[in-house]
């Protein structure tokens, strides 16, 4: 990864995101500047700048039928978590519909859950919350994103218990 800085101290990544020419795609091993980039992305999106204004960049709804053309690509998806669940192997699922076999789902593997806890996000308490997630959309009993770091999940509107006490 190359980090280029302009004369005013703004990084190239910040400039591209702020002008709506790029969306944030954070990775678990590279999250130091994600919060700032997400702020800039939201400002560009709300102002309809660059690709946001052209609708080349969009925040998709969690509708599985609408997501079908976007399988096998990185996308941003927003919706209400209808329920949460856990598998025997410790995976946590965030379900965006009543049928996990076809609806959009987010999964977090057991090995990554401590990162969410450390960030103050109680995944099991997200039922009813509206969240925005970003990542690779795969087909696994409907469209699914596997999150490995909390910076890829934004709480848009969360019920009070969605955050761990004291955070």
Where are these regions (language model features)?
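Small beta-barrel nucleic-acid-binding modules, primarily SNase/OB-fold domains
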Residues: 1-167
